[in-house]
Curated annotation (Swiss-Prot):
This is Lon protease homolog 3, mitochondrial. Residues 112-325 form the Lon N-terminal domain. Its main location: mitochondrion. It comes from Arabidopsis thaliana (Mouse-ear cress). The keyword Transmembrane helix does not apply. InterPro entries: AAA+_ATPase, ATPase_AAA_core, Lon_bac/euk-typ, Lon_lid, Lon_proteolytic, Lon_Prtase, Lon_prtase_N, Lon_prtase_N_sf. Signal peptide: none annotated.
Length: 924
C-alpha cells in the first residue's frame, strides 16, 4: 500500500497506535498554505527526554522502536504516515480536530514570544516538544493559544557560559530561567539577551500545551528585528523568503538528484522512514527534510536554517546526508558484525568445555544469526538465545575447601551456640573431604523463624569456598520461574537455575532454596514437582531449561533448603533431603548473642558510643524472658534497636552528641572536618554561628549552653526497661507457689519454644451415678481423647489404691487448661491429666516443684514425646527443679548441654505407677 497524498484544504489526520503504544498519537499531516507539516499530540513518558537526541525532532517517531519490541507490521503502520509534499492532488482523508488554523492570516511582521532552544534548531516542517518551567512564559503561551494566535519564535541558543550546563536535564528544564539576565541596566540586558540567541529562527505554531510541555510545529523562517519586552522575552520578527532560483538549472537539478539518491540510502536504514516517498518534494523542502532527519549537530542544522540560497542549502544538506550514510554504515558494521563477532569469540573460547550437543545448537543458531538483518525481530531473539548459552560457566568450577578446622572457625564466627547443628555440618564436610566432593546431598535446615537458617547456609558456602545464591521460593506458584519460559512467549527468559549459574559464574555454587515449605501451586503447574528434577542427583545432571532447550549439568551444585515446618514439604521432595533441626537458642545463648553481637551492632548502627549508655545484664535477661521468648533472636534484635533509638533521642535532647556546625548560606566558611570540630572551643563555634546566621545574643547563649552541657550516662536496668520497650508481653508462667488440689503443672512445646501448662480439675456436682467429664480450654481432638483416656486410667488406679473411694463414679468433673484463647493439642499431657484427677479424688496436693510430660496409654504405659529441649528450658524458666520425662526420652535429655541440665532432678519413667510415687509420696 502506497502512502496517501494529501490535499491542501486544511485537513489533518490523526493516526492512533494500539493501546499499548497509547502514549503516542501521531498527526499524519498539517497542511497550511500548500505546505505539509509534521505534528503530534501526545503525553511524553518520563523516560523520553526531548531535545537530547541527535534527531530530536523525530524522537517520538523513533521512540516506539527504541522502547518496545515492535514487529514489522507495527513499523509499516507507522511508516505510512505522511507525504512531505506541496501537491494538492490525491485522496481526501477523514478530518479530525485540526491542529493548525485552516485559514491562517499571518502578516510579514509579527510580535511573538521568543523561546530559546538549547540543543537543536526547529526545522520548518518538523515538530519539537519542549519543557517550559517559567510560569510567566507558560501563561503567555496559553494566553496566545486562547486568542487564536498560537505562534512563537524558536531560536537556537548560542554556545556561552551562561547556558552551558554540566547537567543536560537541568538545561532542558530551566533553559528559560537561565536565559534571563539580571542585575544590569535595561539597555545592556536587552543587548545581551539578543546576543545569546541566533537571530534567524523558526516561526512555530503551538500544537498543544500539556502541563509544562509545549509541542511546537515549525512553520517558516524568520529573523529578529527588535526586542519588545524582556519577561517574557518578546521580539518583533520578519519572515525570511528563499532567494529566487531556476528550477531548470542543470547544476541545481544535479544537486537535487544527488540529495534524493543519498537520502534514500539514509531512509533504507531507518525502518520508520523506509517507505517515505521523497520524489515529489520541492527543492527547499527536500533540503529541510534531509537536514531534519540527519544526525548533524546544532551548528550544521542552524547553517541550513540560515541559508536562503536554495542551491547552497541543498549542498549543505548533501554534506550532512552523506555523513549520515557513512555513520549508518559504521553503525551497521558495529551492531551486526561486532555482535556476531562477540558471540563467535565466546563460542571459540569455551569450545573445549562446552558439551558437544550444546556446541551443535550454538553453531546452528550462529549461522542463523549471520543471515539475519539487525532490524529484524528474529535477530534480537537469536542473539539473546546465544548470549545466554555463551555466558553460562561451562566447565568453570570453584575450588572446594574441605578444611574442617577452618569451617568450624567460620561457623563459630557467624553463629553462637547451635553446637549440635555445627557438628552435623562438620560431619557433612568431613564426608565430602573423604569422597573428594560434597555433591549428591541436599540439606534441609528446619526450625522456627529467626534462628539463623539462611545465615547458616551462607556460612556453609563460605566454609566450602563456594559461590552463594539465594532463591526465595516462598509463595512461588509458576514452574517457569524454575524451568524458564518457552521461547515462543513474549519476554521469555531462562529459569532461576540458569540465571543463578550466570550470576555466580561457576558451575558448582551453593544454592539456597529459602522457605521451601511455603511453595505455592496454581494452574501454571506445581513448583514442588519441578524441584524434584532440580534436586534429584539422578536427574539434575541433565536438567532441561525450557528457554535454552538444551540439557545443563546441575549435579555439581550443592542444594540447601530452609523450612519452618517440614510437614508442609511434599513427601517426595522431603524424601530427597537430609533434615537438620535448629530448635533455637536457650536463654544463656541469647544472652551471649545479645551482649556480644546485637548490642554492639546496634550501637554502631545508631551512632551511640559505649560510654553513652549502660544496658545491664538484668535488663537483657528480662528482655529475653518477658518480651522475646521465641526460639530465634530476630525479635530480640528489634527490641534492642527500639531501646537504642530511644536512647539516641534522649542523648540528642541532652546535647551529648556532636552536631554539624554548617550552614547552607556559606558552606565554604563553615567547612570543617570532624577532628577540627572536636578541637574547636565553644567560643569559636559561636563566632562561626554568629557570622553565618546572625543569631541574637540570647540565641548564642542558648547554643553555647547546648554545646557545653555535660550529659548523664543513660542507665537501663530491669526497673526502667518498661520505659523503653513497654509493658512485658509475657507474664510469669508460674501462677501458684503451691498448686492446689486438682492442679498439676505440665510441660508443652510451642512455636515460641517451650512453656509450662497447668491442668486444672474440679468437681461440678456429686450424686449417686452422676460420674462424668466436661472438658474446656480450646483443646484439639487428640488432647480431648487424651483426657478421656486419663479419666479412665485414673478411675482404674483409684479403684486399685482405694477401692472404697467412689469419687469418680459419683462426681461430675470439669477439666480445664488455662489460656483458653490459645488452641492446644497433642497427647503429651496424658500423665499430667491423670495426676490432676487423682489429686482431686484423694484431696491431696501434688509436689510443688514438680512438672511432668508424657503420653499415656489405656494400660498406664508412658510413651515418648517431642521437644525435650524446649520443655526443659520452660521448666528452668519457672524455677522447677523436678521434671518427669518418659524413659524413651532419656537419650534426648542426655544430649543437652550441661548448663541446661545443671541443678535439675530429672526422673525417667515408663509406667504411671512411678509418677504416682513421685507426685504424692514426696513426704517419704
Amino acid at each position: 500500500m502506497m502512502p496517501k497524498r494529501f490535499n491542501t484544504s486544511g485537513f489533518d489526520t490523526t493516526l492512533r497506535l494500539p493501546s499499548y503504544y497509547g502514549f503516542l498519537h501521531l498527526t499524519q499531516s498539517l497542511t497550511l498554505n500548500s505546505r505539509v507539516f509534521y505534528g503530534a499530540r501526545h503525553v511524553t513518558p518520563p523516560a523520553i527526554r526531548i531535545g537530547s537526541n541527535p534527531v530530536q525532532s523525530l524522537l517520538l517517531f523513533r521512540a516506539p522502536t527504541q522502547l518496545t519490541g515492535w514487529n514489522r507490521s507495527s513499523r509499516d503502520l507507522l511508516g505510512r504516515r505522511v507525504s512531505f509534499s506541496d501537491r494538492s492532488d490525491g485522496v481526501d482523508l477523514l478530518s479530525s480536530s485540526p491542529i493548525l488554523s485552516t485559514n491562517p492570516n499571518l502578516d510579514d511582521s509579527l510580535t511573538v514570544i521568543a523561546l530559546p532552544l538549547p540543543h537543536k534548531p526547529l526545522i520548518p516542517g518538523f515538530y519539537m516538544p519542549i519543557h517550559v518551567k517559567d510560569p510567566k512564559v507558560l501563561a503567555a503561551l496559553q494566553e496566545s493559544t486562547r486568542q487564536q494566535s498560537p505562534y512563537v519564535g524558536a531560536f537556537l541558543l548560542k554556545d556561552c557560559a551562561s547556558t552551558d550546563s554540566s547537567s543536560r536535564s537541568e538545561t532542558e528544564d530551566n533553559v528559560v530561567e537561565k536565559f534571563k539576565v539580571k542585575g544590569k541596566p535595561k539597555k545592556k540586558r536587552r543587548k545581551e539577551l539578543l546576543n545569546r540567541i541566533h537571530q534567524v529562527g523558526t516561526l512555530a505554531q503551538i500544537s498543544s500545551i500539556q502541563g509544562e510541555q509545549v509541542i511546537l510545529v515549525g512553520r517558516r523562517r524568520l529573523i529578529i528585528e527588535e526586542m519588545v519586552s524582556e519577561d517574557p522575552l518578546t521580539v518583533r520578527v520578519d519572515h525570511l523568503k528563499d532567494k529566487p532560483y531556476d528550477k531548470d538549472n542543470a547544476v541545481i537539478k544535479a544537486s537535487y538528484v544527488e540529495v534524493i539518491s543519498t537520502l534514500r540510502e539514509v531512509l533504507k536504514t531507518n525502518s520508520l522512514w523506509r517507505d517515505q516517498d521523497i520524489g515529489d518534494f520541492s527543492y527547499q523542502h527536500l533540503a529541510d527534510f534531509g537536514a531534519g532527519i540527519s544526525g548533524a549537530n546544532k551548528h550544521k542544522n542552524q547553517g541550513v536554517l540560515t541559508e536562503l540560497d536554495v542551491h547552497k542549502r541543498l549542498e549543505l544538506t548533501l554534506e550532512l546526508v552523506k555523513k549520515q550514510v557513512e555513520i549508518n554504515k559504521i553503525k551497521e558494521t558495529d551492531d551486526g558484525s561486532s555482535l556476531s563477532a562477540k558471540i563467535r569469540v565466546r563460542i571459540d573460547t569455551k569450545r573445549d568445555k562446552i558439551p558437544k550437543h550444546v556446541i551443535k545448537v550454538m553453531e546452528e543458531e550462529f549461522t542463523k544469526l549471520e543471515m539475519l538483518e539487525e532490524n529484524y525481530s528474529d535477530f534480537d531473539l537469536t542473539y539473546n538465545y546465544l548470549h545466554w548459552l555463551t555466558v553460562l560457566p561451562w566447565g568453570n568450577f570453584s575450588y572446594e575447601n574441605f578444611d574442617v578446622l577452618r569451617a568450624k572457625k567460620i561457623l563459630d564466627e557467624d553463629h553462637y551456640g547451635l553446637s549440635d547443628v555445627k557438628e552435623r555440618i562438620l560431619e557433612f564436610i568431613a564426608v565430602g573431604r573423604l569422597r573428594g566432593t560434597s555433591q549428591g546431598k541436599i540439606i534441609c535446615l528446619s526450625g522456627p523463624p529467626g534462628v539463623g537458617k539462611t545465615s547458616i547456609g551462607r556460612s556453609i558456602a563460605r566454609a566450602l569456598d563456594r559461590k552463594f545464591f539465594r532463591f526465595s521460593v516462598g509463595g512461588l506458584s509458576d514452574v517457569a520461574e524454575i524451568k524458564g519460559h518457552c521461547q515462543t512467549y513474549v519476554g521469555a527468559m531462562p529459569g532461576k537455575m540458569v540465571q543463578c549459574l550466570k550470576s555466580v559464574g561457576t558451575a558448582n555454587p551453593l544454592i539456597l532454596f529459602d522457605e521451601i515449605d511455603k511453595l505455592g501451586r496454581c494452574h501454571t503447574g506445581d513448583p514442588a514437582s519441578a524441584l524434584l528434577e532440580v534436586m534429584d542427583p539422578e536427574q539434575n545432571a541433565k536438567f532441561l531449561d525450557h528457554f535454552l532447550n538444551v540439557t545443563i549439568d546441575l549435579s555439581k551444585v550443592l542444594f540447601v533448603c530452609t523450612a519452618n515446618v517440614i510437614e508442609m514439604i511434599p513427601g517426595p521432595l522431603l524424601d530427597r533431603m537430609e533434615v537438620i533441626d535448629l530448635s533455637g537458642y536457650v536463654t544463656d545463648e541469647k544472652m551471649h548473642i545479645a551482649r556480644d553481637y546485637l548490642v554492639k551492632k546496634t550501637c554502631r548502627d545508631c551512632g551511640i558510643k559505649p560510654e553513652h549508655v549502660d544496658l545491664s545484664d538484668a535488663a537483657l535477661l528480662s528482655l529475653i524472658e518477658n518480651y522475646c521468648r521465641e526460639a530465634g533472636v530476630r525479635n530480640l534484635q528489634k527490641q534492642i534497636e527500639k531501646i537504642y533509638r530511644k536512647v539516641a533521642l534522649e542523648l540528642v535532647r541532652q546535647g551529648a552528641v556532636s552536631f554539624d556546625v554548617t550552614d547552607t548560606k556559606d558552606t565554604k566558611s563553615l567547612a570543617k572536618t570532624d577532628s577540627e570540630v572536636k578541637r574547636m572551643k565553644v567560643a569559636d563555634i559561636m563566632k562561626i554561628l554568629e557570622s553565618a546566621t546572625g543569631d541574637s545574643t540570647e540565641s548564642k547563649t542558648k547554643q553555647s549552653g547546648l554545646v557545653a552541657k555535660t550529659f548523664e550516662k543513660v542507665m537501663i536496668d530491669e526497673s526502667n526497661l518498661a520505659d523503653y520497650v513497654g509493658k512485658p508481653v509475657f507474664q510469669e508462667e508460674k501462677i501458684y507457689e503451691q498448686t492446689p488440689v486438682g492442679v498439676v503443672m505440665g510441660l508443652a512445646w510451642t512455636s515460641m519454644g517451650g512453656s509450662t501448662l497447668y491442668i486444672e480439675t474440679t468437681f461440678v456436682e456429686e450424686g449417686l451415678g452422676k460420674g462424668g467429664l466436661h472438658i474446656t480450654g480450646q483443646l484439639g481432638d487428640v488432647m480431648k481423647e487424651s483426657a478421656q483416656i486419663a479419666h479412665t486410667v485414673a478411675r482404674r488406679i483409684m479403684f486399685e489404691k482405694e477401692p472404697e473411694n467412689l469419687f469418680f463414679a459419683n462426681s461430675k468433673l470439669h477439666l480445664h487448661v488455662p489460656e483458653g484463647a490459645t488452641p492446644k493439642d497433642g497427647p503429651s499431657a496424658g500423665c499430667t491429666m491423670i495426676t490432676s484427677f487423682l489429686s482431686l479424688a484423694m484431696k491431696k496436693l501434688v509436689r510443688k516443684d514438680l512438672a511432668m510430660t508424657g503420653e499415656v496409654t489405656l494400660t498406664g504405659r508412658i510413651l515418648p514425646i517431642g521437644g525435650v529441649k524446649e520443655k526443659t528450658i520452660a521448666a528452668r524458666r519457672s524455677q522447677i527443679k523436678t521434671i518427669i520425662f518418659p524413659e524413651a526420652n532419656r537419650r534426648d535429655f542426655e544430649e543437652l548441654a550441661e548448663n541446661m541440665k545443671e541443678g535439675l532432678d530429672v526422673h525417667f519413667v515408663d509406667e504411671y505407677e512411678k509418677i504416682f510415687d513421685l507426685a504424692f509420696n514426696y513426704d517419704h
